[in-house]
Amino acid sequence: MTNVIEEKNENYPIKIKECLSDYKPIYYRGNLSLLDKPSIAIVGSRKASSYGKSCARALAKCAVEYGAVVVSGLALGIDSEAHSACLENGGETIAVLANGVDVFYPKRNQAMQKRIEETGLLLSEYEDGTRAQRYTFPVRNRIISAISDAIVIVEAGSRSGSLITAECAQEQGKEVYSIPGNITSPGSLGTNKLIRDGAVPLINFDELFEDLGLSKTNKKINQIFLSKTESRVLEVVKSGSELSIEQIRHIIDIDLAEINAIITILEMKGLIFCEMGKVSIANL
């Protein structure tokens, strides 16, 4: 069920009120109290490289170790990796949506969105039924930065939408961190430019959380448990450089619906990547 907090409500998120002059009603599903906890935004390109995905996952896991909430936008690429790694390590995450919280977008993240609703927080300025439009993404980025104590741009090309998040954060007086990338890679032009222009180069994740005054908690990071069939599928994927779902199904000898479900589960657990029908092992 979707809840709404009007602008004049005394429970309206203080972080948003302090950062934005044009704040609007907030629609949400999940645990609104997560907004009161220390948090970092982890954002970046939809077309992320294996390096970017690995960095996003490692940073999200580190956030869990320090008891910080992970904030992102539920988009493909860096956002998905951050949410997924946080969930798999038993952390708490907030997804700020460019559509209504009842709308599944992107469709590939439907299972993840449901899980965030159950264990974290879905947040949006848009009422139920609103579909994502080109203009709603940059608008929601100012919410991502507003509710976060620090913003990390993991990987971004020269025209990545995550650069808008960085700009919003700077306008709000938030610290922006950027992970350095290969200077010859188009996918790192944006992050490297941010560093050139004054963003903090993030080369040690612990330093970020120490900057926020956080200490590592005693929380044990969740172990990843697999069913017998999940383990079999993972071993098959490990044995080949890049396999189609049909090839895996043929080797394991199970029906298509079951293999698709297992592929989704393993991808949610951050163990594999599935793109364009091809499955490969994750770079952790």
What residue spans do the PLM features occupy?
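Glycine-biased, small-residue-rich flexible motifs in mid-sequence functional cores and linkers
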Residues: 2-284
